């Protein structure tokens, strides 16, 4: 193939120039582009300075705008426009280029248009400022305290009334199972999610039941809660009265014991006086009296020692048994116990709020 092409080229170079066939003539109607592509020599172009385009789309854009999209064509177009002295058409980049048939610009008209544009921009700025009100720096803050008055005419509006008038509210709180307790205090702030902040709060609550007692325990209600609280208060009063009675009995017993000790000391003093008086008694009688008193004291001490030893042994055994039993037994937990406490301030989440009503 290469040899044939070389031979054709050498033959063409040696032979005189022939007129191109109509199939290879670009200006003829019978032009065959496929044959021109595979021809050994490029067909002659009647316009040597014609621009070259990469594709058909670039050629179509050149026909619409008169400016080539590529850098080479753009530079060539600029150079051609500068050389010919004809102003170029406006390009796609937005640069102002006058067409050949466009009239000369009027400077007075341009000045009038600029003045109108400036006045319009100033008017639009004033209107926007009037609509927006104060600027961003002067914008009123938006927070929970500013949003609370906007809930007038709704249940949240009643909460805002309680804040203004200082009315106490009762907030019923729940756990994962049911009612937990009641918080009574003064409302300070709230939001649309029923999150609340209270001060000077008195809470009555019961700890949640866990473990196996959770399955057996019945649901807590307000009546059960406050009935249990009353029962605890009454039992506490009874325990206090019993402790007062025991304290009074102990004080009486201590008084009687002091009286007995005083009487014993008095008897001892009288015995000493009689002993002094009995010095005049004969020595034989004194010796017999001493022996009798010693025998009586020894008998009493043996009895008391035996009884004390037996008593201490029996008490020790009972105490050891009681301690072992206490160790085996688990401490009993009262799940129904109700607690009360006072809190200076508290935050309650809205998901834990069951009911809110005014305190009587």
Swiss-Prot record:
One of its GO terms (cellular component) is nucleoplasm. Residues 299-322 have a biased composition (Polar residues). The C-terminal SM 1 domain is both necessary for the binding to the Sm-binding site of U7 snRNA and U7 snRNP assembly. The N-terminal domain is essential for histone pre-mRNA cleavage. Amino acids 63-82 are sufficient to interact with ZNF473. There is a cross-link at residue 120 (Glycyl lysine isopeptide (Lys-Gly) (interchain with G-Cter in SUMO2)). One of its GO terms (molecular function) is U7 snRNA binding. Residues 154-229 form the Sm domain. Component of the heptameric ring U7 snRNP complex, or U7 Sm protein core complex, at least composed of LSM10, LSM11, SNRPB, SNRPD3, SNRPE, SNRPF, SNRPG and U7 snRNA. Formation of the U7 snRNP is an ATP-dependent process mediated by a specialized SMN complex containing at least the Sm protein core complex and additionally, the U7-specific LSM10 and LSM11 proteins. Identified in a histone pre-mRNA complex, at least composed of ERI1, LSM11, SLBP, SNRPB, SYNCRIP and YBX1. Interacts (via the Sm domains) with CLNS1A. Interacts with SMN and ZNF473. Interacts with PRMT5 and WDR77. GO terms for biological process: mRNA 3'-end processing by stem-loop binding and cleavage; positive regulation of G1/S transition of mitotic cell cycle; regulation of chromatin organization. The keyword Metal-binding does not apply. Belongs to the snRNP Sm proteins family. CDD domains: LSm11_M. InterPro entries: Lsm11, Lsm11_M, LSM_dom_sf, Sm, Sm_dom_euk/arc. PANTHER family: U7 SNRNA-ASSOCIATED SM-LIKE PROTEIN LSM11. This is U7 snRNA-associated Sm-like protein LSm11. Residues 343-356 are annotated as: SM 2. It is found in: Nucleus.
């Amino acid at each position: 193939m290469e040899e044939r092409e070389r031979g054709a080229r050498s033959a063409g170079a040696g032979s005189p120039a022939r007129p191109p066939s109509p199939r290879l003539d670009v200006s003829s109607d019978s032009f065959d582009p496929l044959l021109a592509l595979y021809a050994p020599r490029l067909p002659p172009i009647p316009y040597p300075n014609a621009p070259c385009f990469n594709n058909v789309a670039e050629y179509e854009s050149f026909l619409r705008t008169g400016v080539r999209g590529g850098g080479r064509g753009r530079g060539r177009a600029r150079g051609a426009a500068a050389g010919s002295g004809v102003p170029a058409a406006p390009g796609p980049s937005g640069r102002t280029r006058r067409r050949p048939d466009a009239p000369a610009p009027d400077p007075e008209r341009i000045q009038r248009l600029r003045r109108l544009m400036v006045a319009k921009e100033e008017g639009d700025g004033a209107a926007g400022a009037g609509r927006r009100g104060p600027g961003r720096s002067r914008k009123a803050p938006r927070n929970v305290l500013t949003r609370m008055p906007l809930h007038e005419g709704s249940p949240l509006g009643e909460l805002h009334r309680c804040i203004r008038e200082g009315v106490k509210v009762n907030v019923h709180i729940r756990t994962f199972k049911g009612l937990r307790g009641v918080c009574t205090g003064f409302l300070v702030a709230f939001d649309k999610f029923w999150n609340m902040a209270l001060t000077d709060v008195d809470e009555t609550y019961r700890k949640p039941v866990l473990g196996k007692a959770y399955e057996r325990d019945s649901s807590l209600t307000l009546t059960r809660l406050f009935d249990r609280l009353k029962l605890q208060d009454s039992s506490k009063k009874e325990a206090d009265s019993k402790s007062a009675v025991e304290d009074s009995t102990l004080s009486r017993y201590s008084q009687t014991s002091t009286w007995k000790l005083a009487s014993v000391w008095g008897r001892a003093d009288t015995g000493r006086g009689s002993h002094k008086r009995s010095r005049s008694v004969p020595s034989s009688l004194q010796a017999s009296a001493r022996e009798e008193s010693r025998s009586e004291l020894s008998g009493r001490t043996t009895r008391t020692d035996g009884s004390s030893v037996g008593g201490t042994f029996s008490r020790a055994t009972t105490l050891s048994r009681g301690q072992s039993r206490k160790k085996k037994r688990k401490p009993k937990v009262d799940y129904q116990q109700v607690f009360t406490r006072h809190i200076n301030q508290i935050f309650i989440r809205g998901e834990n709020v069951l009911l809110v009503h005014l305190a009587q």
